[in-house]
């Protein structure tokens, strides 16, 4: 699940409206889970012959770019002077994370894939130590340990049970963690909409070559799903920005874990997959660690 912009990258709210923030986050997380659902449908035979994750991620960036260009045409935000090096690094990480996440979602339950993606903020914290020089206290280390235990439960280590798909999801979380570091640097100097315009435009250029190498003509239903992956992701990101503009980041961040609830419901409704005990325990443990980290970050701010 491609992650939205982190709460710390948006300006402080002018007027606190927590009720509206909850509604915006409920809608945003439903859409974020929806992108993973669409990616799973595209990567399986639900809508036709399975499409390669390279092709799915290309569709995600292409149609997200079209959508955000339409938003930019209406809002007309000043573009300024973009830091192209940071944008390139951020986009490479985002493309890698999206591709790995789409591959994982096609091979494992949405609940497991979504829960493993919540390692992203934990890995961001770990990466911030060498890359941003941040100091980490005992509570944050405890949150990391709890989240990693949950991840190991979800990976089901043991003879014949270790999930390769889980490693793909872990790789996605690592790539998205690196992306979050670069996003923090970018949005300290650039506005969110121009960042999304440049990011998705670069993503199209990066994803085009790999997609052409594995291209399979999509069915009409798959074309609609490819459009949906991009448009739904952008809509979710914009709703997320509306949420963090109406409440403190520490209030909004824990609501992001509603994504896991939606993913579970979608997987059951569309694919008939009900999480087993291992999935539920692992998800609860991992989310507990990530939630502890989010709450501690909120107090620090």
What are these regions (language model features)?
Residues 2-5, 20, 49-96, 175-178, ...:
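Transmembrane alpha-helices of multi-pass small-molecule transport proteins
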Residues 4-5, 261-301:
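C-terminal-most transmembrane helix of multi-pass membrane proteins
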Residues 20-28, 72-101, 164-172, 217-235:
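Loop-to-transmembrane-helix transition segments
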Residues 31-62, 178-202:
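Juxtamembrane helix-loop-helix junctions in multi-pass membrane proteins
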Residues 63-67, 116-130, 145, 201-206, ...:
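Alpha-helical transmembrane segments of compact multi-pass small-molecule transporters, enriched
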Residues 68, 139-156, 278-297:
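Hydrophobic transmembrane alpha-helices of multi-pass small-molecule transport proteins
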């Amino acid at each position: 699940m491609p992650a939205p912009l982190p709460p710390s990258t948006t300006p402080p709210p002018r007027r606190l409206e927590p009720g509206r923030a909850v509604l915006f986050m409920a809608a945003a997380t439903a859409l974020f889970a929806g992108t993973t659902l669409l990616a799973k449908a595209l990567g399986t035979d639900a809508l036709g012959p399975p499409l390669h994750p390279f092709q799915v991620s290309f569709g995600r960036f292409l149609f997200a770019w079209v959508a955000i260009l339409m938003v930019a045409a209406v809002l007309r935000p000043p573009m300024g002077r973009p830091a192209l090096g940071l944008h390139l690094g951020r986009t490479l990480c985002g493309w890698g994370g999206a591709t790995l996440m789409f591959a994982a979602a096609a091979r494992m339950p949405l609940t497991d894939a979504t829960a493993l993606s919540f390692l992203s903020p934990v890995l961001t914290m770990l990466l911030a130590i060498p890359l941003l020089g941040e100091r980490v206290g005992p509570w944050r280390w405890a949150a990391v340990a709890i989240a990693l235990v949950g991840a190991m439960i979800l990976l089901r280590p043991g003879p014949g049970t270790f999930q390769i798909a889980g490693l793909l999801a872990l790789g996605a979380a690592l790539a998205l963690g690196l992306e979050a570091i670069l996003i923090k640097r970018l949005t300290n100097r650039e506005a969110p909409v121009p960042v999304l315009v440049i990011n998705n435009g670069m993503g199209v250029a990066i994803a085009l070559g790999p997609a052409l190498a594995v291209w399979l003509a999509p069915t009409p239903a798959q074309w609609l799903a490819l459009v949906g992956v991009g448009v739904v992701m952008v809509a979710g990101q914009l709703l997320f920005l509306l949420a963090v503009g109406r409440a403190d980041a520490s209030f909004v961040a824990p609501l992001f874990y509603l994504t896991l609830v939606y993913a579970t419901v979608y997987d059951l409704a569309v694919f008939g997959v009900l999480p087993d005990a291992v999935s539920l325990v692992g998800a609860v443990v991992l989310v507990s660690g990530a939630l502890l980290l989010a709450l501690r970050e909120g107090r620090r701010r």
